Amino acid sequence: MRRLFYIILLLAIAPYALQAQVQKQVEVSKDYTPTVSTAQKLSIVPDMTDTVMMRPDVDYTITPRSFETSLMTENFRPATITYWDYSRSRPLYARAAIGMPLVSEADLYLSTYNKDRGYAMAYANHWGDYRSRYNLLGDKVSSNTSQMDNRIGGRAGLFVGERLLEVDLAADHRLRHRYPTLGEKISFGRAEGKIRFGDDFTDLSRWNFNVEARGSYFLDGVDVGDFNQSTVAASASVAKMVGKHVLRLNVGYDGAFGYKALKNYRNNIFSIGARYGLESERLEFLIGADYYYDNVKGSSDSPHHIFPYLRMSWKNTSEGFVPFVEVDGELRRNDFATLMFANPYLRGTSGVAEAVSAQPNETSYNGRVGFGGNVGGGVFAYNLSAELSLADNHLYWYSTGADYNVADAYQHTLRLDAQALLRPVAAFEAEVRAGVYAWENYDDYYSNRPNFNVGASLRYLSRKVRAGVNLDYSSAIKWMTLSDAITENGQPQFGYTKTDGTFTLGVEVEWRINDRWAVYAEGRNLTGSKVYEWLNYYRSTAEGMLGVKFTL
């Protein structure tokens, strides 16, 4: 009887015990705090000649507080949502246009991206101008006047943990003609490549580093092998943020070597630099210096250069007024390949080869002050700045008919710039801009550029239609020329040819038919002004372009 009583008693209280046990298992209270973190972008710089509207890459991450529960057979894993999980890939972009006078343009980009593995892309760019021109006698010339730029390349990156292994290959080709005289063909190009491994220096809470190697080969396509040149380079950087302090170190090597006619050209550059920065609520600054050992084999100039570095800006909550100060320096190589890409009408002669082999590189020290800001949440933005530049071994281009050569001297300039942008409503924006060279040290050397330019633009930017009109004015230009006279020291004497100031009017309209197709039209230099590339090389007719864009 006693045993039966115990059994009945257990059966009676069992439901209450089980209920308490269930409540004990499910009564789990954990805090869950979703946060939206700063966007993390790939350190991929798009190389596009077309003005493609790039959309920002946004990465959202929801991170709960750390906890672990036994309600499930597996531990709870924090949710992670990335932009790439929902973004539709755009593997193909193509653009083609033709215009009158006869002009052609084309761009092609193929790409693929995997958020866990990496990316790959290939591209091709083309620009050609086949219009008739005018020679030195003022006669119209229709043959041997074409100009063309072509570029092909590829880039790929592999994610290795939090870092990226990246390879970049590209080749350029330029075609010109000396149409002011006999129409001689000018053809040259360059193949280049780069491989790098490291971080993108956006998250400095941990040590970031980057190591890379680069190389290129320049080929003179007319006198094959006479003015060829190669470059090799390597660099390494490390950086870390400690609290609000940033530390960065970098070292590098850059060498250039000529062949045949340029066999005496050898340039070896070694560099080392350091940066220290501080970021606070009101002030951001980065200060440092770079040392360069720049040895040009045929030059007698000192190879030692030290460049200061300073970036400082003051912040406020409204962002309506943000002043800044910048100081830096730069070493610009004056090798034959660099000169040809700057001015393709340089005449390659034995004298030029000898001069280039002994030509020191240009050094410049620059200081900039200014202020900018935006008001009304981006309704109005502006920027005003002044730049003082002190350069040594600066190259001044001078012409002799259809050919160009260079003379070096020191150059001191003061430039003032202003820009303002107004967005009264979401789809409209208006822009005005102006720049002036307020001072330059020389009266007998001329920089072949306007002393001032001003411009204004109006744009309408909606999802279906984009349209714009711009009007620019550039002042008269003094083009440096070689005089028949010589100085008392037997040095060449220079003069100038002055060309008038020019107004240029441009109009563009684009209609997006659907998500894949768009058509556009552009009017360039509708005023028919003489727009000079260099003295005696110009275009003076209005241009019209019709094109189509396709995105897959």
Where are these regions (language model features)?
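N-terminal periplasmic/intermembrane-space "pro-region" immediately following the signal or transit peptide
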Residues: Q19-W84
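Solvent-exposed loop/turn segments connecting transmembrane beta-strands
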Residues: R95-D107, D116, N144-M148, V222-N228, ...
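Outer-membrane beta-barrel translocator/receptor signature
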Residues: E74-P78, D85-A94, I98-L136, N144-I152, ...
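Exposed, low-structure sequence patches enriched in small/polar residues
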Residues: A94, N295-L552
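Flexible loop and strand-edge segments within Gram-negative outer membrane beta-barrel domains
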Residues: D129-G153, G157, L165-N208, E212-T231, ...
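Sec-dependent N-terminal signal peptides
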Residues: L4-I13
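Strand-connecting loop/turn motifs
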Residues: S89, K115-Y119, L158-L164, L204-R206, ...
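Transmembrane beta-strand segments that form the barrel wall of outer-membrane beta-barrel proteins
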Residues: R88-M100, A106, A124-G128, A171-H173, ...
